[in-house]
Amino acid sequence: MDIAHFRGIEQMSWRIPKGTHFLALIGPGDSAKSTILSAIDMALSDRWNLAITDSDFYQGDVEKPISIRVALSDLPTSIRHHDMLGMSLAGIDDASELYEDPDDDHDCCAVIALTVDKSLEPTWTAFRPNKPEPIATVTATARRLIGAYKVDERIDTHLRWSRTSALGRLTEAEHGADELLLRASREARKAVSEAIPPELSELVATIQQRLHALGSGEFKDLKPGLDQSLSTSTGNLALYEGPVPLSNFGLGSRRLAGVAAQQMANADKGIILIDEIEYGLEPHRLANLLTCIKDRTDSALAITTTHSPTALRHLDVDDLGIVRRDSNGTVTVKSFAPDQTYLQKLIRRSPEAFLARRVVLAEGKTDYGFLLELLDRWNAELAEGCKPSSAAIGAVAVEGSGGDTIEWARVLADVGYDVVLFIDSDVENDRDAADALTGNGVAVVRWKDGYNIELAVTDTLTASELTVLIDKAIELSDDPSSYRSNVLDHLHAYGLPEEVTTLLVEEWNEHGVGLDGARATVARAAHRRSWFKRVDKGRALAALLLEAEGYPDSDSASKVQELRDAVFAPAPEGRDTGAPDNPSNATEQ
């Protein structure tokens, strides 16, 4: 698929891996995900009267035409033998490179090219490489054989019988809609309850089965009925559940009912497009819809977009297409390699990472809580100055998983995410591996060599502040009354003389324990006995550091500032800027 000069896309070239049957496009807002679906729909649908305006041209520049080109392989016999399409086939290899003619080493493919110039008149032609001029016009009839459709969001339209609705087209295909609707309308003048021909009742029973499969609701008395909100006979026959029209149900139920009707009306079509698949659905119904679409055997390809962490939790990493758009309007869609399935752990734990523009990876629970506390304080400060928060710039904090965190950072950077890695520096191998990621564009922020987060904090505290830290660890434990003695045991195990029986660090000096020794002992005990190994405890640790008397002039303060600079840094040159799809068009495309 190649797109040029369409809405927020100045240029895009995308090759969907061979054998793909389901894809969920993800990425930050305004990265052109919905535009990609619209482009496929416009190029392959059988509509001839596309509603195109000047704002559909990239930056409103109508002097350069819109160009959308889609190559389709695995063609059904009806297309290969078609009078026009069958004579215009090209070749395509496993790497999606096109050839003028198919041969024994290539699959045959049909390449449909949609062009719109400043006259706003669309033209569809067949394309073959090395042919300078369009070789044939692709008619609406020919495009109908391709079988692509985008789920229509005009939900209530498809819950009524009319010439253009899904129910109307489904009825026309099976029974002849005009005659049935006329009969129903005439009978309705006598008695609404007896107005429904048996053919419609049988059809509704089939629709009810489909609604139940998609999880739309538990319908027991689904039937056609007259929608009194419409004044004409065209389209006032609608689906009812008992005495209530489905158009009066909640958004999720209506949307699933509309999806079911459209699926059935387009049962012969091989490409289904759904924008924002989670719209209006609770998590359990969203999960069921995803399963139904992924398991469909009658479609060659389903492409959806989503901003839902719930949706991602029910998908595999190889179901995802990561969409990125740079400041010049160049759009890329990348997928994870098959050997990167270990990222499934990350998508289950922190799906929001895949939906962000910038991912800030913290090594563990303590670091993650520490980072969250910093972000809250920074965002509050920015709000006072009317400046964008971390959420506004698309940055999200993500809890890592020890040794896996560095590899997660590498892979996320490879597929286009801005990544900030926040880790300890007490393990030499991890330190070296993290530093090596700077060549991949990862911003690595770590404490000075040999330091973990506990030591970075205690190294800044006074004796009385160390006592406050110990008291906070006890306060946040599961059983503070018994944990106090445990803490003393921990300290003895990591260097505190046995004769010291107090947790008041100010008194340790009387037993020969100076401030530097106290800091090291408390840090070792806190780290190895996991005093702060919980998100809320990590937050408390950050607060202790930020409120310490010596913090402003400390090395830890400079590292925290380095972290802040990385989180709020401008997007790297050429990366996704988050600008609207089309500055000349106020609505998101």
Residue ranges and their predicted role:
Residues 350-360, 366-589:
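Acidic, Mg2+-coordinating catalytic modules of nucleic-acid enzymes
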Residues 134-207, 457-464, 471-473:
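Coupling/switch segment of ABC-type P-loop NTPase heads
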Residues 45-66, 135, 323, 327-330, ...:
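Flexible phosphate/Mg2+-sensing switch loops adjacent to catalytic phosphate-binding sites
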Residues 168-256, 261-271, 431:
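Extended helical coiled-coil dimerization/tether regions that scaffold
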Residues 37-106:
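Conserved P-loop NTP-binding catalytic core
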Residues 22-23, 149, 359:
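Conserved beta-strand position immediately N-terminal to the Walker
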Residues 1-45, 232-353, 549-589:
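Switch/communication elements of ASCE P-loop NTPase nucleotide-binding domains
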Residues 84-174:
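A sensor for short, sequence-defined functional sites
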